[in-house]
């Protein structure tokens, strides 16, 4: 007998409130998952056999181009705790359905700094490793210890360390070989007891200076507050204007290509990488192509941040993808650089 209550299968479930673009689409079936055991039972349930599956947490990294003909698993796993500590770090575990920003704020309230640069990133804890989220000089992988996940094909629980997750820039095993195969149910982070502020990014440094930290080292809370202020000034609230945050990755090019670009574009915004390659600011490339503030139907490029595509009201996922492809085409033609979309497009 399945542990999965048949009432949990909801037919024709509306997904508008479950994706931050606000696309008005539906799922053939949906199920709200509040316990790991429930997830294990759900994926083994005969009624789910043969159905395509889509895992949604905050829905902040997905473009839904139409109704989903399968089972949507709505991850609502909650809980957070200090699991253990050693001489060097605290190990903090959070359930996959915990809202990311709330979790970061909670760690600071417990006196556990280390994640403050990642404040206000949309989505859930379980989505953070998939994307290897990063911002303002910090990537999640630098604070990652391990995770638990349920394999959708079997319902078995697996534990994975950083090596198994194969993290890269906005990338992981879960976006490649592991795509659509696992649901991350909890993540454990390693927060060092010896904390050092990271405040080198220009926007962040300016905000901190404006708040009185020009000559004194900022606290973790000050960095958190500054990141929130900077992000709110640049990025629209998905509750007010549908979006998925940064739509494109910052491309990384070889040094020779960068030097060639610099001869024709001396103001190009760039960041030298440890391996000698150069990361380019995708927003600058898009802006230079004249896309900031432009629209195609109800899909548009945000007027303050060219990296953000928005739903001005009634746009479909197909319209947003058409806009994204037009931007990619223009950037490639002008700079010879291919932009890669961050969200998963379905």
UniProtKB/Swiss-Prot annotation:
**Residues covered by the FAD-binding PCMH-type domain:** 23-194
Show the Pfam families listed in the entry. FAD_binding_4, MurB_C
Q: Pathway it acts in? A: Cell wall biogenesis; peptidoglycan biosynthesis
The processes (GO biological process) annotated in the record are: cell division; cell wall organization; peptidoglycan biosynthetic process; regulation of cell shape
Entry annotation: catalytic residues: 170, 246 (proton donor), 342
What are the names of the required cofactors? FAD
The reply to whether Signal figures as a keyword in the UniProt entry is: no
Keywords of the record, alphabetical order, are: Cell cycle, Cell division, Cell shape, Cell wall biogenesis/degradation, Cytoplasm, FAD, Flavoprotein, NADP, Oxidoreductase, Peptidoglycan synthesis
Molecular-function annotations in GO = FAD binding; UDP-N-acetylmuramate dehydrogenase activity
By its UniProt entry, which PROSITE patterns does this protein fall under? FAD_PCMH
Annotated Gene Ontology cellular component terms: cytosol
- Would I find Cell cycle among this entry's keywords? yes
Q: Which PANTHER family match?
A: UDP-N-ACETYLENOLPYRUVOYLGLUCOSAMINE REDUCTASE (PTHR21071:SF4)
For this protein, the record's HAMAP family field holds: MurB
Record-given protein name: UDP-N-acetylenolpyruvoylglucosamine reductase
The source organism is: Paraburkholderia phytofirmans (strain DSM 17436 / LMG 22146 / PsJN)
